[in-house]
Structure formats: C-alpha cells, structure tokens
C-alpha cells in the first residue's frame, strides 16, 4: 500500500466515524483498529463521548487499544474529567481494557462514587485492573462506601469489582456487615458469599443475605 492510498483510507475512515449509519461507523472503527494510525486517536476518543450505539462504542474502544498507550492515555485521561457522563464512562472502560497502570492516579474517589451509575461501574472495573498491589485494601474501603447502591446490575458490578480484589476485602466486608445500613449489610454479606462460592447465583446470595440481616448478624441466628 502506498502512502497516498493509506492517507486516503485514513481520511475515509475518519469521515465514516461521523456517518449517520451505525454500520458504517462500525466498519470505520474496525478499519482504523486494523491499521492503527496516530492521526486517528483524537477522533476515536472524541467519538467515544457521543457515539449512541453500544456495538460501535465497543469497536471504538478496541480500535484505541490497538494504538500505543503513549498516544491514547493523554486524551482518555482528559475525558475522565469531562462533564459528559458518557465521555467519563467510555474513557474509564477503555482505560480498563488498555490496562496501563500509569492511569491509576486518574481513578479518583469522585469517579468511584460518581452519581451516574454507568460511570461509577466503569470506574469500579477500571480501578480493580489498575490498582497497585499496595493500594488494594484502601480501594476496597472506598468501594465499600457504595455497598447497597442502585439496582441489581449496579450491585452485581460492585460485588464483582470487590471480589476481583481477593481476600483483602474480608475485613472491609465484615465492618460493613456489622455497622452498615440494612441495604449495605445485605450487599456485603452477599458479596462475601460470592467470594467463597463464585458459582452461587447473585439473587440467591442477596435473598440469603436479607434473611441473615432480618435475623441478626451472622452467628446470631437461632439464638
């Protein structure tokens, strides 16, 4: 392929990212990811913030992972501070896929407790990928402040994030079980049960946790 032909392909793909058809945008992102070019990075990041189609957003993220982190991190780290929730969420999602721990300082307490559930969930997933070993316990303590939040999907996402940290979460879950609000206690108990039995259904763990909370703290049942 000549340089002139490649330049035309890049121009066509960049234009395709703004096409009214999601299938055209999907192909454009695939093309860029297949033949990475630094000139496309800014447009990929920009498009992530506004792309309405989930499949296209996933392809945009994939295309970004195909470029060198030195090229993608600056733009993505800027997006996590955006006022647009989708920009924050998709940037965090992409950072979790890239897995470069230089991004860790950008995962702030504010993002981990973001008012938007999608942003918070993306932040939780990114955090457990990027966190240094020596900060895992502190991260568990911050994540525990979100126990009991939201509906099923949000709670399951938080449980999975906590479980990904391993047994360092046990003291944190114990504290939440002992002193948390009822919803947080239920969520903490269910998360610990899933940690010990990964094959257990989340709904079953929650129902069991509700029963435990209703009867009293673990160890008090039947007294």
Which residues are covered by each model-predicted region?
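Structural detector for internal amphipathic alpha-helices that build alpha-solenoid repeat scaffolds
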Residues: 1-6, 12-15, 22-37, 46-47, ...
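Alpha-solenoid HEAT/Armadillo-like helical repeat scaffolds in large eukaryotic proteins
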Residues: 12-16, 43-51, 75-83, 106-114, ...
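Ankyrin-repeat and related helical/solenoid repeat scaffolds used for protein-protein interactions
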Residues: 137-187
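Eukaryotic acidic, Ser/Thr-rich intrinsically disordered low-complexity regions
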Residues: 174-223
């Amino acid at each position: 392929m000549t340089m002139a032909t490649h330049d035309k392909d890049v121009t066509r793909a960049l234009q395709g990212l703004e096409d009214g058809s999601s299938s055209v945008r999907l192909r454009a992102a695939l093309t860029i990811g297949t033949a990475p070019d630094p000139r496309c990075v800014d447009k990929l990041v920009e498009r992530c913030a506004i792309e309405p189609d989930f499949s296209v957003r996933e392809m945009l993220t994939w295309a970004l992972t195909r470029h060198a982190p030195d090229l993608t991190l600056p733009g993505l780290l800027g997006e996590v501070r955006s006022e647009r929730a989708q920009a924050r969420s998709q940037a965090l999602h992409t950072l979790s896929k890239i897995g470069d721990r230089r991004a860790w300082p950008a995962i702030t307490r504010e993002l981990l407790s973001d008012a938007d559930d999608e942003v918070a969930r993306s932040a939780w997933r990114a955090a457990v990928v990027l966190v240094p070993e020596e900060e895992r316990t502190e991260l568990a303590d911050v994540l525990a402040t979100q126990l009991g939040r939201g509906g099923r999907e949000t709670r399951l996402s938080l449980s999975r994030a906590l479980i990904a940290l391993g047994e360092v979460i046990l003291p944190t879950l114990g504290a939440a079980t002992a002193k948390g609000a009822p919803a947080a206690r239920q969520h903490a108990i269910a998360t610990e049960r899933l940690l010990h039995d990964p094959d257990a259904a989340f709904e079953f763990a929650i129902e069991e946790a509700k029963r435990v909370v209703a009867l009293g703290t673990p160890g008090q049942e039947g007294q």
